[in-house]
A protein has these predicted regions:
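Single conserved hydrophobic/aromatic residue that forms the stacking wall/gate
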Residues: 1-8, 12
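Glycine-rich active-site loop/strand segments that organize a redox cofactor
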Residues: 10-40
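A short alpha-helix-loop-beta-strand transition element characteristic
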Residues: 31-38, 48-66, 104, 174-177, ...
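Conserved redox-cofactor binding core of oxidoreductases
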Residues: 52-131, 143, 187-191, 211
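A glycine-rich dinucleotide-binding beta-alpha-beta segment and adjacent secondary-structure elements
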Residues: 107, 112-127, 260-313
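Core beta-strand elements of the Rossmann-like FAD/NAD(P) dinucleotide-binding domain
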Residues: 131-139, 302-303
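An anion/pyrophosphate-binding glycine-rich loop and adjacent beta-alpha core
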Residues: 167, 173-280
């Protein structure tokens, strides 16, 4: 634990909190709530340290936590675990939950409604093995994820259809900015695939990947905010009369690519593209639901005893 905490301290030393806040505000066109952004930036290091202590393995350079860069960030400040950071975070948290005797996990269980009494949430109704189960609780937390499953092109799993949001709307729980939907610039283009799109991580561009049109010419700064890059790609696709543009990483060292982006390399290879030699066909796809159930700084919704966290909020 000591060595892991020290690694997180190294992260903190290299982090410029004020610049992080400004980058976030600028990318959000200053529509963000400053107080919320300040908390995000100031608590980020503590959260990373907690994850390291839980057992999250982050990539390192010279024994210290490594950083990459993504869109709208003015410096390298993104910590990562190979090219499957989200999966690593998820698995680390699941393992931590399994250790807690006060947490009971119900897998393959679907929430279909919450139970209310006098504008107070007192439980939920779930389906498991085709059986309806009523769970009563003093507090209910919605963490049902996003809405990507309703889009033809999305990097999300198909089962993410906004169920938590629908339940909140049914009970007149306040929502906010539900028209704010993030379109990721670079999902792997497959002509006849209506399933979940393979995300080509933004860090690929952060490590030097270049976006090219059909003439193999760059047409945008790859590290502008995602909405700006996506709009530029859509515009270029229309000009090229194509459903994709190219992402080129062939100028990068092949062994580095195979190591740093092992998952993307393997998945593209399965789909017939060797990223060390071939241009990657990419197109924008729905990625993240920016709006959701309105909450305060403690994740409390407009309904008593009901909270919301994560992408649904």
């Amino acid at each position: 634990t000591q060595s892991r905490s020290s690694a997180a301290s190294d992260v903190y030393k290299r982090q410029d909190i004020n610049l992080f806040i400004e980058d976030t505000l600028r990318a959000g066109q200053y529509k963000n709530k400053l107080e919320y952004v300040e908390i995000l930036a100031n608590e980020s290091m503590d959260n990373i340290e907690s994850m390291i202590n839980y057992g999250l393995n982050l990539d390192k350079e010279d024994g210290k936590v490594a950083f990459t860069r993504e869109g709208a960030h003015s410096i390298n400040r993104i910590v990562y675990s190979k090219d499957t950071t989200g999966k690593a975070v998820f698995e680390t948290l699941i393992e931590e939950c399994k250790k807690r005797k006060n947490i009971i996990l119900y897998e393959d269980t679907c929430l279909i409604d919450i139970i209310t009494d006098c504008d107070k949430c007192i439980g939920g109704v779930v389906i498991k093995n085709q059986k309806e189960i009523i769970i009563c609780s003093k507090v209910v937390v919605l963490a049902t994820g996003g809405i990507g499953g309703v889009f033809k092109n999305s990097t999300n799993q198909r089962h993410l259809t906004g169920d938590g949001l629908a339940i909140a709307l049914k009970h007149n729980v306040k929502v906010k900015d539900i028209n704010y939907i993030q379109i990721h610039p670079t999902a792997f283009y497959e002509e006849n695939n209506d399933n979940r799109k393979l995300l080509i991580s933004e860090s690929v561009r952060g490590e030097g990947g270049k976006l090219l049109n059909k003439h193999k010419e760059r047409f945008v700064d790859e590290l502008l905010p995602r909405d700006v890059v996506s709009k530029a790609i859509f515009k270029q696709m229309k000009m090229d009369n194509r459903e994709y543009v190219y992402l080129d990483v062939t100028h990068l060292d092949s062994e580095y690519l195979k190591s740093r982006f092992s998952f993307i390399y393997e998945q593209c290879l399965i789909r017939g593209t060797d990223i060390t030699k071939d241009y990657i066909k990419v197109a924008p796809a729905q990625h993240y639901f920016m709006g959701g159930i309105e909450v305060d700084l403690h994740s409390k919704t407009s309904m008593n005893n009901l909270y919301a966290v994560g992408e649904v909020s």
